[in-house]
Amino acid sequence: MFIMSSISHAQLGWNDAGTPVSDQFDDVYFSNVNGLAETRYVFLEQNHLPQRWHNDDQRRFVIAETGFGTGLNFLAVWQAFVAFREANPDAKLKELHFISFEKYPLSKSDLIQAHQAWPELAQFAQKLHKHYPLAIPECQRIVLNDGLVTLDLWFGDIKDCLPKVATQEQGLVDAWFLDGFAPSKNPEMWNQNLFAGMAKLAKHGCTCATFTSAGFVRRGLIDAGFAMKKVKGFGTKREMIAGSLSEKVPYTNIAPEFRFEATHGLQEVAIIGGGIASATLATTLARRGVAVTLYCADEKPAQGASGNRQGAVYPLLSGDHNAVSRVFAPAFLFARQWIEQAAEQINFDHDWCGVTQLMWDEKATDKLKSMLEGNFPTQLVHGLSAEQTNQQVGVPVDKASVHYPLGGWLSPAELTQGLIHLLEQQGKLTAHYQTPIDALTWQPETQLWQLRSGDTLMSHQCVVIASGHQFDSLSQTAELPLGKVKGQVSHIPTTETLSKINSVLCYDGYMTPVSQQNGYHCIGASYDRQHLDATFDPQAQHENAQKLIHCLPEQTWPLEVDVSGNQSRQGVRCVSRDHLPFVGNVGEFSKITEQYRDLAQQHQAEPIALYPQLYALVGLGSRGLSSAPLMAELLASQMCGDPMPLGVDLLEQLHPSRMWVRKLRKGKALTQKV
């Protein structure tokens, strides 16, 4: 599958009417006369919106568009949907999902300038500006209006992106906006592959409208399965075409060995856990109207690996754009957006001060220089000379580095506890503390899971295991090939010099700037696979300080790091060998072992055996703060049958059964642990 490495911004000019014009395609982005009126006529009216929304019994309505451009179509339909919801608060349709593809996204400054033309859309445009993503390939998800509206921006050529949109057999899209520059200006886009791809993603009865009346477009859409007709064009334009998918041919691009299932009619869910994975998932499901019950073995949230005072937030990138990099780049941008939205509702210690990774030895230098060859946007990551690093960090290090200007740190404990307490106050979550779940049993007659805690039994429609390193306490997830690594973080008092550190510093360890709340830094963290208890480790405490001294031997200020107070915190990370989380339906180990024992010889794999209505969100490792929000969004989308925020090939890389499948494909037998 083709992997895009970088995205170019649109090159714009502005004509006498103040309309943006593409230098690449020599065409206007919208009508010189009244672009907003044209959008409403061509795309809303001809797709029968908002009338269709009144009788729609779905929870979420999905629109897909072939060219985002200035976002005019999106802003117009967002405005219409808000008006619909305000006028019809009891309607079954609750959410709007807008998927758009764009090869040359506008820069943020050009987007803001273009939006000056429509003051009536200003309140929506400003929200879009706030979270408009960097130009990173593939899907960038933006959640707006507390989940009322979701925007998926697929950056890249539509011919490469469209096949990556994960699609179940019944289809995904309710209405297509076939937009973009005129076929005469951009003939490469308007072709039969596009029309066929639109039909593959469409549901039965999906409508379609486009401003053009070109015969080859109409014939191509008809050949793809759409019933198209000419209708009166907007303003002085004589004709345009509109129609609907008359016959849906079942299609899926999801491999049977990596299939996933929604929980039909999902109303309530039990989450087993209590850390950042549980808190982000509970928040994301609550936005979708799902009632959440949390079962936590501890006396309050964030007592495990999510309980640290300060944790760094920055992406894990690779110059070759491997799967880890392709997951973490959008995950980090989504985390930034998600955390900023959380900060509008709850208080937690955090600072977007940037993260600086030092080239402290030859190995680190080679690794970081290789990463910079990935041609990432400079706002995401860029290199710094030794002198620039000194200025950025605030204390002398005299090492070159890479800097993540959008990174920073936050308090995982405060964020996790704040999110869960907010949901409790809102009546969206019921928490049961000191309630470890001992066993799960599927009840076929009721189609419910029975949970046992001691002598107490509870029943739930759906269950998510998000219990970190305790994943193996339940038989259904005990065989997942995950590891456990203890980490100790040291809390050190600041000094006059240490207080000048103004960026998270990463080397063979990490050190945060001082927290203004408590006057302490966090420095860490140890990696111990042998001892998984929560007891203080004096050797780890000493090594946390020594790592900094070892990496910066010429500097004197690291000697001010004082760990002698033995203030620290211990936690156990849940880690995967490939550095990616396990997100999705839980597979039945014993059945998979049997059904796939000759997978290497199978031409077409049979659908993988999954436990009904059982999911996992585990293996977040050391970068959980950067990945948890998007992984929670991905899992909630999967559970609810919504469009997915990552490409179908990346979903395979996150599937909880992936390592079993890989091994069986090689003709190797599964042992108890892969």
UniProtKB/Swiss-Prot annotation:
Its main location: cytoplasm. One of its GO terms (biological process) is methylation. It catalyses: 5-aminomethyl-2-thiouridine(34) in tRNA + S-adenosyl-L-methionine = 5-methylaminomethyl-2-thiouridine(34) in tRNA + S-adenosyl-L-homocysteine + H(+). Its EC number is 2.1.1.61, 1.5.-.-. Pfam families: DAO, Methyltransf_30. It is found in: Cytoplasm. GO terms for cellular component: cytoplasm. Keywords: Cytoplasm, FAD, Flavoprotein, Methyltransferase, Multifunctional enzyme, Oxidoreductase, S-adenosyl-L-methionine, Transferase, tRNA processing. It comes from the Bacteria. Residues 1-246 are annotated as: tRNA (mnm(5)s(2)U34)-methyltransferase. Residues 272-674 are annotated as: FAD-dependent cmnm(5)s(2)U34 oxidoreductase. GO terms for molecular function: flavin adenine dinucleotide binding; oxidoreductase activity, acting on the CH-NH group of donors; tRNA (5-methylaminomethyl-2-thiouridylate)(34)-methyltransferase activity. InterPro entries: FAD-dep_OxRdtase (IPR006076), FAD/NAD-bd_sf (IPR036188), MnmC-like_methylTransf (IPR008471), SAM-dependent_MTases_sf (IPR029063), tRNA_MAMT_biosynth_bifunc_MnmC (IPR023032), tRNA_MNMC2 (IPR047785), tRNA_S-uridine_synth_MnmC_C (IPR017610). Its cofactor is FAD. In the N-terminal section; belongs to the methyltransferase superfamily. tRNA (mnm(5)s(2)U34)-methyltransferase family. In the C-terminal section; belongs to the DAO family. HAMAP family: MnmC. Catalyzes the last two steps in the biosynthesis of 5-methylaminomethyl-2-thiouridine (mnm(5)s(2)U) at the wobble position (U34) in tRNA. Catalyzes the FAD-dependent demodification of cmnm(5)s(2)U34 to nm(5)s(2)U34, followed by the transfer of a methyl group from S-adenosyl-L-methionine to nm(5)s(2)U34, to form mnm(5)s(2)U34. This is tRNA 5-methylaminomethyl-2-thiouridine biosynthesis bifunctional protein MnmC. It comes from Vibrio cholerae serotype O1 (strain ATCC 39315 / El Tor Inaba N16961). The gene is mnmC.
